[in-house]
């Protein structure tokens, strides 16, 4: 099948993404027809589905390369696969913690913003002070506890 057909079979992966995956080495270069069209077989589709699922789980390109190498290696050690997964879980947990901290901070700031026609706003002050490299003054000015 050609690249357009492959992208339809593997939903969520555009023709452009398939070319990109080929360029960065996630998938092997496709065979070409006499008129230089890419041709994909069942193994290529299976690999694209593997890449898409790994991407859906949030793995980085480098992690996907590692997982593909392990997937292709029939003598692999499952401990290596588990190590990649555990590293990714730890990374996701760090991101979740950072997002939770941002959410808490924004909720706190939003609760102290009057949301009326006054120009004073702890949200803007917090962002402006952080952009200036200053310690946020929103806490002192608006009587907020430390964030």
UniProtKB/Swiss-Prot annotation:
Cellular compartments annotated: Cytoplasm
GO molecular function list: copper ion binding; DNA binding; DNA-binding transcription factor activity
Recorded superkingdom: Bacteria
UniProt keyword annotations, A-Z: Copper, Cytoplasm, DNA-binding, Plasmid, Transcription, Transcription regulation
Gene Ontology terms: biological process: positive regulation of DNA-templated transcription
GO cellular component, one term: cytoplasm
Domain HTH merR-type, residue spans: 1-70
DNA-binding region as annotated in the record: 3-22
Major localisation: cytoplasm
Job description of the protein: Transcriptional regulator involved in acid tolerance. Binds copper.
Domain notes: It contains a N-terminal DNA binding region and a C-terminal metal binding region.
Protein name, per record: Heavy metal-dependent transcription regulator 1
Species the sequence originates in: Rhizobium meliloti (strain 1021)
Higher taxonomy: Bacteria, Pseudomonadati, Pseudomonadota, Alphaproteobacteria, Hyphomicrobiales
Gene field: hmrR1
């Amino acid at each position: 099948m050609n690249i357009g057909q492959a992208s339809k079979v593997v939903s969520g992966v555009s023709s452009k993404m398939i070319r990109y995956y080929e360029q960065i080495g996630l998938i092997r270069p496709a065979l070409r027809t006499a008129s230089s069209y890419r041709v994909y077989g069942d193994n290529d589709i299976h690999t694209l589905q593997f890449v898409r699922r790994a991407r859906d789980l949030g793995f980085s390109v480098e992690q996907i390369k590692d997982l593909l190498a392990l997937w292709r290696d029939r003598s692999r050690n499952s401990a290596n696969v588990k190590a990649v997964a555990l590293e990714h879980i730890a990374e996701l947990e760090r991101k979740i913690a950072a997002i939770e901290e941002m959410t808490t901070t924004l909720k706190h700031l939003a609760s102290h913003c009057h949301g009326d026609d006054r120009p004073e706003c702890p949200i803007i002050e917090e962002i402006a002070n952080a952009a200036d490299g200053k310690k946020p003054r929103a806490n002192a000015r608006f009587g907020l506890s430390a964030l």
